[in-house]
A protein has these predicted regions:
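Hydrophobic residues within beta-strands of alpha/beta enzymes
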Residues: 35-37, 104, 151, 191, ...
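Generic structural "secondary-structure junction" signal
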Residues: 84-86, 118, 153-156, 207, ...
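Residues that form or immediately flank small-molecule/cofactor binding pockets and catalytic motifs
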Residues: 81, 156, 258-261
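Divalent metal-binding pocket/active-site signature
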Residues: 17, 42-44, 99, 103-184, ...
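Charged catalytic cores and adjacent phosphate/nucleic-acid-binding surfaces used
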Residues: 1-10, 20, 112, 164-268
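Histidine/acidic residue-rich metal-binding segments in metalloenzymes
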Residues: 55-68, 75-77, 94-99, 127-150, ...
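A metal-dependent hydrolase metal-coordination microenvironment
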Residues: 1-136, 234
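Active-site flanking residues adjacent to catalytic metal/cofactor-binding acidic residues
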Residues: 6, 38, 80, 152-154, ...
Length: 268
């Protein structure tokens, strides 16, 4: 049975046109008890800032209206996915603090003001250099940001750039990965298992299984599962793989969130 989906995008995101009604009806059909809408909030990306603007007043008002509309069928959570960079901390955290979020994902979608997906960074760095720079930036982000619950798709850097950029150099970056995970744990923050990697032809979820195992080895406890769906058909996709993996390493729960606090739910 599917428990929830804590990474879903709607028509409020610059890269989705999916209606909220279709999202909630799909989640209800799948038997989910709660779902977090986590539309994109980004700031200061070269040539793309306007695409990622999120009208937080209208967004919050709308999600809370839908929460009331569907309250007898599913628990709708007000979430957001904040694309962070070291220099945008003050602006973005001040924005997040203004609203009654249940759940906040922090993600790194851009390095040095350039969107990783657009290919500019790959022109100047090979796979090894880019992955190293990415994890150095993620470490700076987790050290400085506080207004979030989980870090999204931590090894997202492998998604773009074509075949020669695929695959995580886990051992080569383990020093940085360990510092990132230890910082998250010390701040009582979690990670997500993001199942979109199967749809991006990497045949895995983000982050890789070694990284998830390491988080728990170091004492981490907070874990969410998200589809990163931008259309309703992807909600809950490949969650059975994530559930089976967690149980195989002795983790028998995932988290929901209420007013920024984790609620642990057993995987059945």
């Amino acid at each position: 049975m599917l428990i929830n989906d804590y990474h879903v995008h709607s028509e409020f995101s610059g890269d989705s046109q999916e209606s909220l009604d279709k999202i909630f009806k799909r989640a209800i059909d799948l038997g989910m008890k709660d779902i977090a809408i986590t539309d994109h909030l980004e700031y200061d990306i070269v040539g793309m800032t306007d695409r990622w603007k999120l009208d937080l007043d209208r967004y919050t008002k709308t999600i809370l209206e839908y929460k009331e509309k569907y309250k007898d069928q599913i628990d709708v959570k007000l979430g957001v996915e904040v694309g962070i960079q070291p220099h945008t901390r003050e602006h973005l955290e001040n924005e997040v603090k203004k609203y009654p979020f249940d759940f906040v994902i922090n993600s790194t979608h851009a390095l040095d003001r350039h969107d990783i997906a657009m290919g500019e960074l790959q022109k100047h760095m090979n796979k090894e250099q880019l992955q190293r720079h990415y994890f150095e930036t993620v470490l700076k982000n987790v050290q400085s940001y506080n207004e979030f619950n989980v870090y999204g798709h931590i090894d997202f850097i492998t998604r773009y750039g074509g075949e020669k950029y695929r695959g995580l150099n886990y051992k080569e970056n383990l020093d940085l990965i360990d510092e990132i995970l230890k910082t998250l744990i010390n701040k009582h923050k979690g990670i997500e298992i993001n199942t979109s990697g199967f749809r991006y032809k990497e045949d895995r979820f983000y982050p890789c299984t070694d990284l998830v195992k390491r988080y728990f080895e170091l004492g981490g406890e907070i874990i969410t599962i998200g589809s990163d769906a931008h259309i309703n058909e992807y909600i809950g996709m490949d969650f059975d793989v994530a559930y089976d993996f967690l149980k195989s390493i002795g983790v028998n729960y995932i988290c929901s969130f209420e007013k920024m606090q984790p609620v642990f739910k057993k995987i059945k």
